[in-house]
Design a protein with these regions (language model features):
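Generic protein-terminus/edge-of-domain signal
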Residues: 1-85, 91-92
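Short, functional N-terminal and low-complexity linear motifs
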Residues: 41-43, 127-133, 152-153
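N-terminal regulatory/effector-sensing and dimerization cores
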Residues: 50-143
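Amphipathic alpha-helical segments enriched in hydrophobic/aromatic residues interleaved with Lys/Arg
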Residues: 139-161
């Protein structure tokens, strides 16, 4: 399922219920409506052959299952304090952090505590062929391992303002 299709479906269901629904509720609705999605995030496809961008917010401890993608994913944490499983490593992610996830790397957020504030993030998906072009332009950048970049207390903090 493409991201745009999922967002349209989510808008329709939210309008019908007259309130925003969580991703977990959306997955239950898919199952109820006869769609078979074992893992909503694993099934996602890019709309573009270059870059897709969207923002995502979790207000509850949605059960996002371990999943991977066929494209690169970058997450910029706008709010929230969660742990993130990247491959076999676990990281504490907080406001201002950037996560870079190569294709095929299993990942998921871990909601170990009650969410005191929503887990809000900007998400950028980058098609592998487009990333290859970027690498040719910028020179060699090792992109086979996940990366967590902290921006708090650095010159990169201006991105949030």
């Amino acid at each position: 399922m493409k991201l745009s299709e999922m967002q349209k479906y989510k808008e329709l269901v939210s309008a019908h219920k007259r309130s925003e629904i969580s991703n977990e509720e959306l997955q239950k609705t898919f199952i109820t409506d006869g769609a078979i999605l074992s893992n909503l995030y694993q099934e996602m496809e890019m709309d573009s052959d270059s870059v897709d961008c969207h923002d995502d917010v979790n207000y509850t401890k949605d059960s996002i299952q371990l999943h991977s993608h066929t494209f690169y994913e970058m997450l910029y944490c706008r709010s929230g304090n969660v742990q993130y499983l990247l491959g076999a490593e676990r990281y504490r992610v907080r406001r201002g952090d950037i996560i870079f996830i190569p294709p095929g790397i299993s990942h998921r957020p871990l909601y170990l505590d009650q969410l005191a504030e929503p887990y809000s993030r900007y998400v950028i998906w980058i098609h592998p062929e487009f990333m290859k072009n970027i690498q040719q332009f910028l020179g060699f950048i090792p992109l086979s391992d996940p990366v967590l970049l902290r921006t708090q207390d650095s010159g990169w903090e201006y991105m949030e303002r």
